[in-house]
Amino acid sequence: MRSGVITQKLGMTSIYNDTGERVPVTVLRLENCQVIAQRTVEKNGYTAVQLGVGLAKFEKTSKALRGHFSKALVEPKAKIVEFRVSSDNLLDVGTEITVEHFVPGQRVDVTGTSIGKGFAGVMKRHNFGGHRASHGNSITHRAHGSTGQCQDPGKVFKGKKMAGHMGQVRVTTQNVEVVSIDVDRGLILVRGAVSGSKGAWVLVRDAVKKRLPDNAPRPAGVRSPANVKVKPATPIAEVSVAEGVE
């Protein structure tokens, strides 16, 4: 099981495939997505990676998070999410995941927060048909009608469809197709609509109900860590002098 990624929704557009078919796509941007912590079986009882994405202002970051980011040698992140992974797919702290983590044609599960609609009636919220427009009806044109029975059971059952707050909930869309990726601009184009407003954070993971393509990179499509310290090579002049002395 590989790690997912944190992307930002830019909006929707449409492209044309090789057969001339118009394909509606949602554009997701993956930028500065780095591993900031690991979870191991020995220390935590499970394996996972904690990812951070975006850039947050230092003065608006709490002291606890400042220490968390400085320990990982990464800049403060705007969004932090933890993804469960298998032990063979653990990533080193500081590793940056790129859009090459996914391949065109792959199926993914996309999770976002739906757009809030406020307090909505049953016709908008649950697609009720409503009551008659005339012929003696008044006031209750868009009402839900009966909410239960009489003395027995004497209550409204849980889950009864009624008016209430609509939207602003976590929604996962499964088996969404990755149409294409743009490595230079860090974009992922997925088929169809994705829950969330423009600029919202969207989680993208490998589909749990589809087989991972053989050409998908394992453990992830990564860029070299920025915090890896390279040991400086010995100057050529010093080597020649040392050899001459010997």
UniProtKB/Swiss-Prot annotation:
UniProt cross-references to InterPro entries, sorted A to Z: Ribosomal_uL3, Ribosomal_uL3_bac/org-type, Ribosomal_uL3_CS, Transl_B-barrel_sf
Mod. after translation: Methylated by PrmB.
Gene Ontology molecular function: any one: rRNA binding
UniProt keyword Ion transport present: no
GO biological process: translation
Entry keyword annotation includes RNA-binding: yes
Residues with the N5-methylglutamine modification: Q151
GO cellular component: cytosolic large ribosomal subunit
PROSITE patterns: RIBOSOMAL_L3
UniProt keywords, alphabetically: Methylation, Ribonucleoprotein, Ribosomal protein, RNA-binding, rRNA-binding
Function of the protein: One of the primary rRNA binding proteins, it binds directly near the 3'-end of the 23S rRNA, where it nucleates assembly of the 50S subunit.
Family: Belongs to the universal ribosomal protein uL3 family.
Subunit structure: Part of the 50S ribosomal subunit. Forms a cluster with proteins L14 and L19.
Protein known as: Large ribosomal subunit protein uL3
Organism: Bartonella bacilliformis (strain ATCC 35685 / KC583 / Herrer 020/F12,63)
Gene: rplC1
